[in-house]
């Protein structure tokens, strides 16, 4: 455990940041999960709406450094690809 007052303060701040960042990561996963559920249910409109809601959240968390920018891009790309495939299957 930290001995000096400044080290104790830094430990407290680090714990606060850790729990807040965990909450934000959980929120991103929930938004992604909502898109995946809509895709699995083959509900194109709901999937598009969920994706539209998820993209700004994913981008914001990437800007804040909660998730890596490449991971954010990968999630958006894959989700959008699944939605496009769902739309093409519905059109055919």
Swiss-Prot record:
Residues 1-23 are annotated as: Disordered. GO terms for cellular component: cytosol; small ribosomal subunit. GO terms for molecular function: small ribosomal subunit rRNA binding; structural constituent of ribosome. The keyword Cell division does not apply. The keyword Cell membrane does not apply. Keywords: Ribonucleoprotein, Ribosomal protein, RNA-binding, rRNA-binding. Pfam families: Ribosomal_S20p. Disulfide bonds: none annotated. One of its GO terms (biological process) is translation. Belongs to the bacterial ribosomal protein bS20 family. HAMAP family: Ribosomal_bS20 (MF_00500). Binds directly to 16S ribosomal RNA. PANTHER family: 30S RIBOSOMAL PROTEIN S20, SMALL RIBOSOMAL SUBUNIT PROTEIN BS20C. This is Small ribosomal subunit protein bS20.
């Amino acid at each position: 455990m930290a001995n000096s007052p400044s080290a104790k303060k830094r430990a407290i701040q680090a714990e606060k940041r850790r729990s807040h960042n965990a909450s934000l990561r959980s929120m991103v996963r929930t938004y992604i999960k909502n898109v995946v559920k809509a895709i699995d249910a083959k509900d194109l409109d709901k999937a598009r709406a969920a994706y539209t809601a998820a993209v700004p959240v994913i981008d914001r968390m990437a800007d804040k450094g909660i998730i890596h920018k490449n991971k954010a891009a990968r999630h958006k790309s894959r989700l959008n690809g699944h939605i496009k495939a769902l739309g093409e299957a519905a059109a055919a």
